[in-house]
Amino acid sequence: KRVPTCHRTSYDAITADEDYKLAIQYADISQKIIYEAEAKAIDEIQKGILTISQNEKPYDVFICYKETDESGKRTQDSVLANDIYHQLTQEGFKVFYAAITLEDKLGQEYEPYIFAALNSAKVMLVIGSKPEYFTAVWVKNEWSRYLKLMKGDRSKLLIPCYKDMDAYELPEEFAHLQAQDMGKIGFINDIVRGIKKVINKD
C-alpha cells in the first residue's frame, strides 16, 4: 500500500485542484477509484498537519539554511544561522530555527511545524555560503513556498543572506530582493535592525 507524503502542505483541498479535477475527468473507472482513494488519504494527512499547525504559536522570523554538507558535516551556514538565532531571540523575537525548534520533534513529521512557521513568520532569512546551498532541495522547498506566500501577503519579507560568494550568484528568484552580505562586519546588527523595522520590536 502506498502512503502519500506531504512536503508542501496547502490550505487548499486536493479535490479542488484543477489538475486533480482533470485527472478525474479523463480517468477510466479503475483509475478514478485509485485517484479518489489517494485523494482521500492525502486529505486525511492534510487535516492532521493543519490541526497540529493551528496549535503552534506564531513566529516572527524563519531561518532557512542547509544544516549539513554532502559528507554529513555541519555547514558554515548552520553556524551562522545559530549565531543569528541567538541574537534574534535575545532581542525578543520568536524564531523558527530547525536545529533547535525541531529538536524535540524527533520521530515526528516536521511538515506541520514548518508549515505553521512559514505561514506565520513575517520575515524569512535565507542563509547561504555557496550557490548550491541556496538551491538544495529542502532549502529551496522552504524559500519557494515563502515567496509564494509573499504574493498574497505584502507584509512578509524575505532577506537573502550570503557569504563567500557574489550577490549575482544568488537564485534569480531573489533578484528583486535586498540581500545582506554576511562577510561584512556587524552584519547581524544590520539584520536585526532591518527586522525591527518590519516587526516594530523596539
Feature-to-residue mapping (PLM):
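Short acidic-hydrophobic, aromatic-tinged amphipathic segments that line or gate anion-handling sites
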Residues: A179-G183
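Glycine-rich, phosphate-binding/catalytic loops in enzymes
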Residues: N141-R145
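Short beta-alpha junction loops
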Residues: R2, K130-P131, C161-A167
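Active-site-adjacent loop/helix micro-motif of nuclease/hydrolase catalytic cores
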Residues: Q76-S78, Y133-K140
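Flexible, glycine-rich phosphate/dinucleotide-binding loops
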Residues: E70, D104, Y133-F134, A167-Y168
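Conserved N-terminal substructure of TIR/SEFIR domains
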Residues: D12-I127, L147-L157, I185-D202
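Glycine-rich, charge-decorated loop segments at or immediately adjacent to ligand/cofactor-binding or catalytic sites
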Residues: M165-L177
